[in-house]
Swiss-Prot record:
The UniProt record lists the keyword Protein biosynthesis: yes
Example of a GO biological process term: positive regulation of translational termination
Organismal lineage: Archaea, Methanobacteriati, Methanobacteriota, Methanomada group, Methanopyri
Keyword Transferase: no
Its biological purpose: Functions by promoting the formation of the first peptide bond.
CDD domains, alphabetized: S1_aIF5A
Molecular function per GO: ribosome binding; RNA binding; translation elongation factor activity; translation initiation factor activity
Source superkingdom: Archaea
Disulfide bonds: none
Protein name as catalogued: Translation initiation factor 5A
Gene3D superfamilies linked: 2.30.30.30, Nucleic acid-binding proteins (2.40.50.140)
Subcellular location, principal: cytoplasm
Subcellular location: Cytoplasm
Amino acid sequence: MDVAVKKVEVRQLKKGKYIMIDDEPCKIVEYTTSSPGKHGSAKARIVAVGLFDGKKRTLTKPVDAKVDVPVIERKTAQVVSDMGDTVQLMDMETYETFEVQKPEDEELASQLEPGTMVEYMEAAGKRKIVGIKEEE
């Protein structure tokens, strides 16, 4: 799978940013560093939640280590059809059609009718609806 990532030093990360842990794009919810001891450099402890699976993951690395950060794109699509657990979307720039899981948020899922414009995020080859696109 061709995943768009960039290499970043651990010291450049902070809460709210994104990181790849176990090949899953995650949002950092906790970032703590321990001061360097007699031997070795400072270490960072990162707690992050998977963007697509919601699982909590922990990573401990030296602050000068390089880690992968996912390239996350936010795009606009139109709902083509409701297919039960999934909805078919059409990207408004490329006109590509694809299926995505319905969001777990019941209020958001109930608004997904054919013709509705939605905002979705794409990272690591996965897609997820993040909200309804308001009319401008």
